[in-house]
Amino acid sequence: MNKTSIFQRPSWVVVFALTAAIAWGWAYPLIKLGMSEFGILPDMTGCKMLFAGIRFFISGLIILAIAKMSGRSIGGRSRRGRQYNPRKFGVRKAADWWFILLFSLLNTTLHYAFFYFGLSHNAGARSAILNSMSVFTVVIFACVFFKSDRMTVRKAVGCVVGFIGILALNLGGKDSGRFTLLGDGMIILNALCGASASLLTRGLSKRVDVFVGTGYSLSIGGALLVVPGLLAGGTLPVVSLTGLIILLLLIAISTIGFSLYNKLLSCNPVGKVAIFNSLIPVVGAVTSCLCLGETFYWKYVVAGALATTGIYIINKEK
């Protein structure tokens, strides 16, 4: 008798997906607060890469350590030399490391390089809503690349409504925010990288245990941020207890968020999991305004409502 995994049970899918989404929503104000506490200015590229890299490198090591303690193999063979099931343990063959490297670049290095650059030049609330573009992009990409995810009228309408919401961010006067390449442009590139990485998660699960693969992607991707950051002269100009606490919170968000989200993507249709990220722009916008004292413009309500409505329309499909 086959038992359904807890990550495939509808009620638990909702709980785990929303937990990851809420955690990621809090990352917006925490990253900006962290850069402020560490004295990192918008033009300090190396420092931003170092700050991001430390977060993900440590998070990846924590996940790998937990994987090791829980009995998962991070090398592919048992102590007796027998090969594990490649779908469950370790890396099946050397060629699969290239896939893991690609996943690390998209899921961590490029994804968060663009994110940290964009967020340092943009308001947290605006960035959170703009980043909801990744949800609709995942739905569209999934319908193109996976037979199990088919484009339907509901999905099409939901995506259109969502994109209109994103365009609504540019309504109003200049004082309420306009498109900028260093701000909005970087966040859009971040969203595209995140969407692409979501599609690759299924391929990752065929090559290595998803939990182990997540640890690899975060640690490798984090290292690929730390090294160039150091080479560019990056440092943490000011180190304080508050800054370290914020960094620990960001590490926890990465560890919990990616572990849950990637596991869900490997067990369920991509589109059905990604739409729960509708909560990210809402949480990100609200927490940014509350924690950072940012001005809450009326267009944030319009954009957030349209984006959330679009994702709700997609999620209603059975």
Where are these regions (language model features)?
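Helix-helix packing/entry segments at the starts of transmembrane helices
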Residues: 54, 108, 112, 126-133, ...
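Glycine-/small-residue-enriched transmembrane alpha-helix faces in small-molecule transporters
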Residues: 1-53, 177-203
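Hydrophobic transmembrane alpha-helices of multi-pass small-molecule transport proteins
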Residues: 63, 140-141, 153-172, 225, ...
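Transmembrane alpha-helices of multi-pass small-molecule transport proteins
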Residues: 41-109, 137-141, 193-200, 214-232, ...
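Loop-to-transmembrane alpha-helix entry segments
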Residues: 128-131, 147-168, 177-184, 240-241, ...
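Specific transmembrane alpha-helical segments of multi-pass solute transporters/efflux pumps
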Residues: 27, 70-127, 131, 168, ...
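Hydrophobic/aromatic residues within transmembrane alpha-helices
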Residues: 34, 51, 118, 144-147, ...
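Juxtamembrane helix-entry segments on the extracytoplasmic side of multipass membrane proteins
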Residues: 9-14, 44-49, 92-97, 171-193, ...
